């Protein structure tokens, strides 16, 4: 299983090979604070409706200053290296609001956040904060699963007349459906780590067992239709 994971990691990370040391470090930090949870017998239900034996709770990183700072600085570095002439940072509500604000502060850039639905009172805003038409925006997410909610935020920013030049996140599950969605939306995506890298580190360090890997492999074959114990 370890050999399999390593081959997948190598393939999936070719486009961001220069981040490989950070991929390993990010994976180790997420596992150390137990941001990755496994419940094969009592699977989680995602917002998409998918059942999953694994859940990544990146909100936990906010409670650990060392991990929080690492993610902030690495996302800021990635944005500085990968995207030019950034005018503003946008966080996707709710998980990416604090991390997005931290990244914007590190880069000394304006920050806004995008709600999933407009407020039902007051100004009824979908985007909180100020964007001006023509601004180049990088969106911050806490993690990427199917990409649906992330790309809704992109659409909202574009409707305001701004240009979304990319998205960054701490983690992605790397589903083909998400990769296709980002490609179709013409949104470059860069993440600090990914499912395969985290699982490789988890197996190597004893965080998961080989029987867990078998369950996860079955889930990965068809996550939209996977059911516990089947």
Task: Place the predicted regions along the sequence by residue.
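Short, small-residue-biased leader/transition segments that mark boundaries at the very start
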Residues: 2-4
């Amino acid at each position: 299983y370890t050999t399999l994971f390593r081959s997948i990691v190598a393939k999936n990370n070719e486009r961001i090979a220069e981040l490989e040391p950070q991929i390993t470090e990010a994976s180790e930090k997420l596992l150390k604070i137990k941001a990755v949870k496994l419940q094969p017998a009592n699977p989680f239900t995602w917002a998409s409706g998918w059942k999953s034996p694994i859940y990544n709770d990146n909100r936990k990183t906010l409670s650990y200053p060392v991990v929080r700072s690492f993610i902030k600085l690495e996302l800021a570095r990635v944005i500085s290296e990968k995207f030019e002439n950034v005018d503003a940072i946008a966080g996707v509500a709710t998980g990416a609001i604090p991390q997005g604000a931290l990244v914007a502060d590190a880069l000394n850039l304006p920050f806004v956040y995008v709600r999933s639905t407009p407020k039902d009172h007051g100004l009824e805003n979908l985007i909180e904060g100020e964007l001006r038409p023509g601004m180049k925006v990088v969106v911050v997410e806490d993690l990427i699963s199917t990409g649906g909610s992330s790309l809704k935020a992109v659409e909202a920013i574009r409707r305001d007349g701004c240009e979304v030049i990319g998205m960054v996140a701490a983690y992605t599950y790397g589903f083909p459906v998400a990769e296709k969605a980002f490609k179709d939306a013409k949104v470059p995506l860069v993440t600090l780590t990914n499912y395969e890298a985290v699982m490789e580190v988890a197996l190597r360090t004893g965080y998961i067992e080989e029987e867990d890997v078998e369950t996860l492999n079955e889930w990965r074959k068809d996550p939209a239709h996977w059911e516990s114990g089947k």
